[in-house]
Amino acid sequence: MAKQDVIEMEGTVVESLPNAMFRVELDNSFNILAHISGKIRRNYIKILPGDRVKVELTPYDLTKGRITYRLRK
């Protein structure tokens, strides 16, 4: 998947699920299921419910995404 094929959006983590999965509510009020990117996992960045995050979505499946950045409060 090329970098220009992704859709970047911001949202809020609603719920933490097993296996490093999170339910994220996007700014347009859609709920998606997102997992953590490798760089966040490698740098031990904690993501908790209530955190603002940047999410990448593919145009093929808009219900799943990848958390790429945790925004500052």
Swiss-Prot record:
PROSITE patterns: S1_IF1_TYPE
SUPFAM superfamilies in the cross-refs: Nucleic acid-binding proteins
Cellular component terms per the entry's GO annotation: cytosol
Coiled-coil parts of chain: none
Pfam family, one: eIF-1a
Gene Ontology MF terms: ribosome binding; rRNA binding; translation initiation factor activity
SMART domains listed in its UniProt record: S1
Domain of life according to the entry: Bacteria
Domain S1-like: 1-72
Summary of subunit composition and partner proteins: Component of the 30S ribosomal translation pre-initiation complex which assembles on the 30S ribosome in the order IF-2 and IF-3, IF-1 and N-formylmethionyl-tRNA(fMet); mRNA recruitment can occur at any time during PIC assembly.
Protein name: Translation initiation factor IF-1
